[in-house]
Structures are given as C-alpha cells and as structure tokens.
Regions:
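Gly-rich Lys/Arg/Thr-decorated short loops/hinges at beta-loop-alpha junctions or inter-strand turns
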Residues: 53-63, 202-210, 255-258
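Short, acidic (Asp/Glu-rich) active-site segment that either coordinates a divalent metal cofactor
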Residues: 160-211
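Alpha-helical scaffold elements adjacent to nucleotide-binding pockets in ATP/GTP-utilizing enzyme cores
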Residues: 5-6, 189
Length: 350
C-alpha cells in the first residue's frame, strides 16, 4: 500500500520535468529503472539496496576470520546496475550509501578496504564512474555492529532506439543467463537455515565449498551482455533481472503473457542444499530464489543464436530456456518439467 501511495504521489510531480526540457516517456513507471526523455536521448535513474547479505559476511568472518566484503561491494553495485540496464541504459555514475550505527565500524581496516575495493570493482565491471556517496552514522537507528548498504546510479540511452521498452510478442524466445549463486535475494531464509545447521555457515554443500562461501559468491553484473547486444543491433524486446520473487519475476511485464520454461537445468548445488536442509519445497524455492538464473532476455526466435553468441562473447553462460505465448488475459510462468505454475496474482511488484 505504501509503495502504491508513493507511486501515485510521484506521478503527480511529472509536470516539474518540463521546465528542464525533459518529459516522462510512456510505460516507465513501475519498471526497474525510471526514465526521463530528452530530444535525442533518455536518462535513467535507479535506487537499490543490498538487503541482508552483509549479515552473512559478518557471521562468516567471525567463524573463519576471512572477510567477504569485497564480494559485498560488488553485490551492492550489481543490484543497482542490473536494474538500471533493464531499460537499455548504460551506467554512467554510481553512488554508494553506507549507513552505520557507529563510526567504529570503519575501523576494521581489512573489512573497510575490502568493501571499497569491491565497490570500485563493481563499477569497473559496469563501465561506470564511482561518483561519490554518503556514509552517515545513525546512532539508535542502525545497529552499531552492522552497515546498511545501498546506492543509486544514473545511466543514458543513446541512440533512443536502444531503449528496451517491453514490446514482448507471442512466440518470443526466452534466454537465460546464469547467476553466480543466490546473488542478493532470499538471504533472510538462508540465514534462518544456517541457524538450524550444527556447523552453521561452515557446513559443506557438497561441491567443495561451505554454505557460507557459496552464499557469499559475488553477483554477476549483466551490463556487458546488454551493451554487446546493442553493439550488434540485436533487438531485446524485454529483459528481467531475476532477483526477489524468484522465477515469478519472469512475468514482471505488465501486459499479460504466459511464459513457458521448457529447458530447465539442474539447480546448482547451493540451491539443492537449501531445499534439502531447509527443507524448502520446490514451489517455494523457485518462487524465492533465482535457482541459477540471474537474468532473462526475450527476443524474436530468429535472433536466438545471435543473442547466445553475444552472451558467450561477453563472458556469460546462457541458454535457450523457453518461449512466450498470448493466452488472453492470463499471466503466468509455467515450468512443465517441474510441475510448477505461478499465476499472475502471485507477483505484486507494481
């Protein structure tokens, strides 16, 4: 309700763009990035938060003495720019917001420098300058032993034809790009599971890594995939950053379609471990976690091979996963091989 109230109030401020020579383009509100239109380009803006992943890093550091804050820095940038690029914008500038409850948090030099280096690494991967930020000390509001990480980014779409507008059509192919692991969503459930394990985050998940190490793998940044497609003039009808809400996020587009996923890879070891030890049902897992899929692209079937080639050449593991069909007003994600269907009313993100 609060989010909808914000969107309603925000929409009533659109007239304030005109004096600056800008306007609001159609179908931008409710998407992952907000666009502002000029004569020959669009500007894009995103604000995003990391979530609770750094709490896992804190507990793993206590157990092992190893800092994973480089990965946390990359994660923070990833969650911002992966949303920004969904509209076709190339990131220009990223800002960090790092709120602590006690300024002594920064006195742990290994942790602090790891965070700085990771954030800078994320910006380099995104092709964006780290433009600044804010490091407030919020005593009484933030726990003195933790940090709340978030940030924002500005991007640009030029030429305007590079905009990804969401013109999905029946028959479009769905291409998946692999994730590095849990990335930045579902961590609350993951932390609850750790509390029930005798060895906690030190528990082996069966692939040579501990539970903590697997959870803290740095997120993939998908900017290079989108920019490579733009360079090759491959039209992306829509893309989705698969974060919160798991595979339900595949139906984020407002227009109703049925998204059938016919090529399902085995879930990576981390997710199999979570399902077994939770236990977490198959239905809850695919509704919560990315299950090995970090990004999805929707393209004309004639462009599948070109899109897969662009993904591979820019360093991503990608595959043809399914297709889109129009079934009247129905919106759903259907995964036949798993016996799973998520109807449109299970996703509320607008």
């Amino acid at each position: 309700a609060f989010k909808r109230a914000c969107q309603k109030a925000a929409s009533q401020t659109v007239d304030l763009l005109a004096p600056h020579g800008y306007k609001e383009p159609s179908e931008t509100r409710g998407e992952s990035a907000y666009l502002i239109e000029a004569n020959d380009h669009f500007l894009a803006h995103v604000e995003e938060g990391l979530g609770t992943k750094n709490l896992v890093a804190d507990l793993v550091e206590k157990q092992t003495g190893k800092s994973f804050y480089r990965e946390i820095g990359v994660d923070t940038v990833a969650t911002i720019v992966n949303d920004l690029v969904t509209c076709g914008a190339k990131p220009i500038s990223v800002a960090m917001h790092a709120a602590v409850g006690d300024s002594n948090w920064f006195s742990n030099e290994v942790r602090a420098s790891s965070l700085v280096n990771g954030f800078a690494e994320g910006c380099r991967k995104a092709g964006a300058v780290w433009g600044g930020g804010e490091t407030p000390t919020l005593r009484g509001l933030v726990d003195p032993n933790t940090i709340v990480l978030a940030g924002s980014a500005i991007g640009r779409i030029s030429p305007k034809s590079d905009r990804i507008i969401g013109d999905v059509k029946s028959g479009n192919a769905i291409i998946f790009l692999a994730s590095s692991g849990v990335q930045t969503n579902g961590l609350t459930l993951c932390r609850q599971l750790a509390e029930s394990l005798p060895q906690g985050y030190g528990t082996s998940i069966g692939d040579g890594r501990t539970y903590g190490e697997a959870l803290l793998a740095a997120s993939e940044i998908y900017v290079s995939f989108v920019t490579e497609c733009q360079k090759r003039k491959i039209k992306l009808n829509y893309v989705s950053h698969v974060t919160g809400h798991g595979w339900r996020k595949l139906m984020r587009l407002e227009e109703p379609f049925v998204y059938t996923i016919s090529n399902v890879r085995q879930a990576p070891a981390l997710f199999r471990f979570i399902m077994e030890k939770g236990p977490v049902s198959l239905r809850e897992a695919y509704a919560t976690f990315n299950m090995g899929v970090g990004f999805a692209a929707y393209v004309d079937p004639s462009l599948v091979e070109q899109t897969l080639s662009a993904a591979k050449d820019s360093g991503y593991d990608a595959w043809l996963a399914g297709h889109v069909t129009k079934e009247g007003s129905r919106k759903a994600v259907v995964i036949p091989s798993l016996g799973l269907t998520y109807e449109g009313d299970t996703l509320q993100v607008r």
